[in-house]
Curated annotation (Swiss-Prot):
Belongs to the azoreductase type 1 family. Its EC number is 1.6.5.-, 1.7.1.17. Keywords: Flavoprotein, FMN, NAD, Oxidoreductase. FMN binds at residues 14, 20-22, 99-102. Its cofactor is FMN. Quinone reductase that provides resistance to thiol-specific stress caused by electrophilic quinones. The lineage of its organism: Bacteria, Pseudomonadati, Pseudomonadota, Gammaproteobacteria, Oceanospirillales. The keyword Metal-binding does not apply. This is FMN-dependent NADH:quinone oxidoreductase 1. Homodimer. Pfam families: Flavodoxin_2.
Amino acid sequence: MSQPITRILKIDSSARAESSMSRKLAQQLTEQLIAANPGAEVVSRDVSGGLPFVTEEWIGASYTPADQRTEAQNQALALSDSLIEEVQAADTLVIAVPMYNFSVPATLKAYIDQICRAQVTFRYTEQGPVGLLENKKAYVVTVTGGTPVNSAADFVSAYMRQVLGFIGIKDVTFINADRIMVDPESILADAQQQIAAATEVAAA
């Protein structure tokens, strides 16, 4: 039996607002997860407006022990700390990812760089990196205009699975609305069926 969902972190990254299909599908998925888990809290994070890129100061601060950081270093990591706290507090992530030129939006990549922190969301071992954000579920809603998901040109799916696993989130379900420009009506209907199936499993 699935564990009840208590807090959902919904992450949007599309540059589009009202017309964004990834936003609409992610919202539908979130609403159905809430319906299956009454009382679940939702925290929304829209990264489309852009986040700071990682800088030399950020890197230096992140590798400095917390009790040895200067005030400037603490300020350099303040946003990263806040974003990581949101992820740590959630048991479920819903990530809306439109494909831009075969990959994820630059704003989403900037967000991911902010939350991938050594000794915070992953640690190095002799056997390789180990993720520290365990016991979480992620749903990745991907939308492409004309590129088939899991094709050689799809650099979204493998990347999202890899980076989520890197920080410890290995239970990942993809909701795919690929080639939406080819047949929008049928592709949307199929994505909604995927959402229904995923939320049915979550409620089981």
